[in-house]
Amino acid sequence: MKSHIQSLLEQAIQTLKQQAIIPADFEARIQVDRTKDKTHGDFATNLAMMLTKVARKNPREVAQLIIDSLPQNSQVAKVEIAGPGFINFFIDENALTNQLMAALSDDHLGVTLPTPQTVVVDYSSPNLAKEMHVGHLRSTIIGDAVVRALEFQGHKVIRQNHVGDWGTQFGMLLAYMEELRAQQGEQAQVELADLESFYRAAKVRFDESEEFATRARQLVVELQSGDEYCNKLWREFNDISLSHCHEVYERLGVSLTRADVRGESAYNDDLEQVVRDLDAQGLLSESNGAKVVFQDEFQTKEGEPLPVIIQKADGGFLYATSDLAAMRYRSNVLKADRALYFVDLRQALHFQQVFSLARTANFVRPELSLEHMGFGTMNGEDGRPFKTRSGGVVKLVDLLSEAETRALELVRSKNPDMDEEELAKIAKVVGIASVKYADLSKNRASDYIFSFEQMLSFEGNTAPYLLYAYTRVAGIFKRAAEIDLTGASIKLEHDKEKELGNKLAQFAEVLGRMVAKGQPHALCGYLFELAGAFSSFYEACPVLAADSEDEKKSRLLLAQLTAKTLKQGLDLLGIETLERM
C-alpha cells in the first residue's frame, strides 16, 4: 500500500509539472511513512514542504495543489492536510481487507515482485585451512537471510563464497605435511582429521624455525608455479576445510553449497592482467618497490596520500588485486545489477578504495551498484570480541553445540514428560534459532553482546518467544480443524482486529526495506511486533468462542494469515519453525 501511495504522488507531481507549477526538471524525493496515530490516517508525507521553494507557495497551498492533482483511487478513503503542510492518507477499509484476503491465497503473501535484477552476494567467505569460528557467524547468516529475501522477491541471486583458499598460509601447511611425512610416512595424513590442530602446529614450527619458514615460502612459490605435488596437497587441504564449512552451514540451515564456492584462487590468472590494465591507464605508481594506486579522495589523518597496494615489492598480490579481478568478473561476466559484500565494518576503507578504483579503471559497468554491507563484532559480556575462557578463538561448531545443550535443558524444564527423542529435535531447532535470531535481530552495523541467557529467554524479541508465538497460533487450527473456511472473508470491526490487519499488511514493505538496505533486523522487529499484535488481538477478540459464525471465521482467517506470515518471515531468516514446543 505504501508503494501505491507513492505512485499516486508521483502522478500528482507529473500533473503539477505539466501545469508549470513546479519545474519540469525538478526531481522530487517522495517519502511516505506510516502514521503512529491512526486519527491522522494510515500514511503521511511531507512532500508539500519539500516543494514549497520551487512552487513559490506556502506548504498548505502546495499540499492542496497536490491533493487536487491526485488521481481518483478506490483504495484511498480520504486525504487531509495536517499541521504546517503534512498530507495524511486514510486507506479504505475494504481495500485493506481485500489486500489481506489476497495475501492469504498467495504463496508470496501478496508481495508484488519488483523488476527482477541479477544480484551477486559475497558472504561467509572464511579463510580455509582452519575451522570456522564465531567471527564467521555474522557474514554467513546475515548474508544468507538477505539472499533468501531477494529470491523471495523474484531476483536472480548468485551466491559467491569468496573463500581464502590461497596465500602464504598454504606454504606453511605444505612444509609441515612434508616434515610429518618424512617422519611418519603416509600415517601423517591422519593428522589432517583435526585441521585446526594441524594449522596451530604448523604455525608454531613457522615461528620457531627460520629454516622451516624459508621452506614454507619456497613451497608457496612452487604452488603458484603449478607444481603438481604442491597442488595435489593444496586441493586436499581445501577439500577437508570446505567439508568442515559445509557441515557448519548444514547445522545453521544456510543455503550455501559447494557450487557457490569461488575463492581467491579462481582469480589467480587475472591478477597480472589487472596490473597491466592499471598500468596502461597510467594509474600505477611505485612506492618502496611496490606497485600502488593513489586516489585524491583517500588520505591519512595527516593529509598524506593513502595508497591501494596492487603488487608487493616481492611480486606478491594482495586482497585489493583479487577483489578488483572479482569485481570485473561479477560485472562483466555475471552481469550483476547489484554486488553486495557482507564483510566486517573494519574493512570499510578497503572497500571504499577498491570500489572507487574499479570505477576509475572502468573495470565495472557504470550501472552496477557496489555495496559494502558492513557489520559490527559479536562481543562477550566483557564487551570484547567473544573468546574462550583461556582467551582462544571459539569454534563455531562448539558454540552451536553449547546452544543446543542449553536449549535442551530449557525445553526439558518446560516439558518434563516429553520423550527424549522429541526433546532433542526441539532443542536442536531452538538452540540454532536462538543463536541466529540473537544476531539477526541486531542492527548489522552495531556491535552486540552475546548472551546465552538472553537469547534463550521466552520474553522479549527472541527466537524462543517467536517460535512459541507461532506454535500458539498454529494450535488454534488443531482445535478448529473441522471448521470449513470456504467462502469466508475477513472483517475488521474491533480495534485489535484493525491493528492486527494493519500490521499484517506491512509485510511486503518491511521485506523491501530489508532487501534494499541488507538489514534483517527490520524483519525481526516486524515479526516481534506482529506476534505482539496477535497476542493483543487474541486476548481481546475470542476466536473459537466468537459471537457469530462469520466473526469466528473472520478471526480464524486473521489467525491463519498471522501463522503464515510468521512462518514465512522466520523461513526468510533461515529459521525452522515448530508445531509443538
UniProtKB/Swiss-Prot annotation:
Keywords: Aminoacyl-tRNA synthetase, ATP-binding, Cytoplasm, Ligase, Nucleotide-binding, Protein biosynthesis. The keyword Phosphoprotein does not apply. A motif ('HIGH' region) lies at residues 126-136. One of its GO terms (cellular component) is cytoplasm. GO terms for biological process: arginyl-tRNA aminoacylation. CDD domains: Anticodon_Ia_Arg (cd07956), ArgRS_core (cd00671). Its EC number is 6.1.1.19. It comes from the Bacteria. GO terms for molecular function: arginine-tRNA ligase activity; ATP binding. It is found in: Cytoplasm. Monomer. This is Arginine--tRNA ligase. It comes from Shewanella loihica (strain ATCC BAA-1088 / PV-4). The gene is argS.
